[in-house]
Amino acid sequence: MPHSDELDAGDVLAVENLNIAFMQEQHKIAAVRNLSFSLQRGETLAIVGESGSGKSVTALALMRLLEQAGGLVQCDKMLLQRRSREVIELSEQSAAQMRHVRGADMAMIFQEPMTSLNPVFTVGEQIAESIRLHQNASREEAMVEAKRMLDQVRIPEAQTILSRYPHQLSGGMRQRVMIAMALSCRPAVLIADEPTTALDVTIQAQILQLIKVLQKEMSMGVIFITHDMGVVAEIADRVLVMYQGEAVETGSVEQIFHAPQHPYTRALLAAVPQLGAMKGLDYPRRFPLISLEHPAKQEPPIEQKTVVDGEPVLRVRNLVSRFPLRSGLLNRVTREVHAVEKVSFDLWPGETLSLVGESGSGKSTTGWALLRLVESQGGEIIFNGQRIDTLSPGKLQALRRDIQFIFQDPYASLDPRQTIGDSILEPLRVHGLLPGKEAAARVAWLLERVGLLPEHAWRYPHEFSGGQRQRICIARALALNPKVIIADEAVSALDVSIRGQIINLLLDLQRDFGIAYLFISHDMAVVERISHRVAAMYLGQIVEIGPRRAVFENPQHPYTRKLLAAVPVAEPSRQRPQRVLLSDDLPSNIHLRGEEVAAVSLQCVGPGHYVAQPQSEYAFMRR
């Protein structure tokens, strides 16, 4: 039913008194209460707030995707102006009508592209499906349009990418595919739910710029859901702040950042880690915690002087890890991905060494190779004086009690059929460490330490938000009191307050138990806060390594400087350089089988500070 006279001039979407609830054990749990907002054509509205504040369920309610999940949605008004300029009431549309609205008039980019894309269909088939459905195009026409969309989101060799499957693409490429799919029918409204959270800083910067460019080209309204205030400053026109299911403040991006009125807004801004905040400091510092009574409750500046002198707990020498690529009629291995090439470093008890770099630089593969989750083709891995790269599977299992891994994707790390209490309890059972009652008490303690409740132990992974699932994975990794924890983007999906709590927890455990962390991250502000030393990886090799203060305050390698320059800053008035929208700034690390790559030569430029001399300056400085 048209409502053309009920939208204000320029508005493409208007919501009044939105209420969302879920039934749990015959009780109605309110998720969103009396939420009202509007969106103008060509405008970006950022919805910000912590995990559980109601941001994502609001987006799902607009897309009418909550009913099938048991959500109870009530709204006085939910008007959308379609591409045809017809205004419809979304709550009155049937399921069949909504299938035509989704994609054609409203589209959504989800937080986790790997779980949003169908693993059994090629990229081209998935984009073409939306085009055929909404534009009545033939298969051939849809594939031509799919290639054009991949070109539009700046994916090179689009024709080749069309025939690839999601698992064959990097995280940044998969997110661009999601954007191409969402924009393939030129929707009036795009909802982006944390689309850059898991991406490295350079790809994140390109994705943000890409959304702005395409928004201008299509005169599209954008709802951008995020907890990253630096991203908000870079992309938003207006900001809506949510807390416990309610809107507590709304205004222009300048008003929110320069004159916030609500205590929670001030607390959010004060808790944002600022790059450069650790200038002049040698050791990690705790994060300030969000508090409505004390907007940025600063804890005493306790220095983390936790590194133990003596022998390293972990020593890596000339680590090599490669993946075969098959081709030809005989399906022979003809090329190899040189993921990690002759990487060497030491890790001392009580130390945090951070690995930073772009997608495809070899950070995660290095972490996986240390636990033999992927095989290495060369080098030595020595833990507590014992070589572990040659251990039998039985001995390796016992060793994994002392080296634990926190993976990047929390949903894929948890068994959907197990309660989270059982998931945390599993490593204790496998190693036979605690009897039943003591183990249950340990689970309750771990849940509380990571900011959850003991009664959450009886719930399943799908009942938690992405940030909460990551906290569960961290609790499981801490269960065995390991000596080394490899954290692969462990806090990238968390909002600022929970991220601060988790980092502070990791620092407390490091201080109390001498745990060493290999911290893999793209969040340079967090890396600056938590690290004793930092190593920058490029094309599988370490190109700069040294004390955190030296690397951040005096970066020597062009690639390190590029990573630091790409970090979003929580200041909307700051002028940002325009970047070339490339799918990946890295040259290819795929080589013919048997071809050897020259190892970089690290030169000492300061105490403990080593840097490689770039062989080709332009390769590191592309923008």
Curated annotation (Swiss-Prot):
InterPro entries the record matches: AAA+_ATPase, ABC_transp_ATP-bind, ABC_transporter-like_ATP-bd, ABC_transporter-like_CS, Oligopep_ABC_C, P-loop_NTPase
The reactions it catalyses are: glutathione(out) + ATP + H2O = glutathione(in) + ADP + phosphate + H(+)
Name it.
Glutathione import ATP-binding protein GsiA
Q: Where does ATP bind?
A: 49-56, 357-364
* GO annotation terms (biological process): peptide transport; transmembrane transport
Q: Give an example GO molecular function.
A: ATP binding
Q: SUPFAM superfamilies under this entry? A: P-loop containing nucleoside triphosphate hydrolases
| Transmembrane parts of this sequence | none
Q: How does it assemble?
A: The complex is composed of two ATP-binding proteins (GsiA), two transmembrane proteins (GsiC and GsiD) and a solute-binding protein (GsiB).
Sequence ranges assigned to domain ABC transporter in this UniProt record? 15-269, 314-564
Give the organism, scientific name.
Answer: Escherichia coli O1:K1 / APEC
Topological category with respect to the lipid bilayer = Peripheral membrane protein
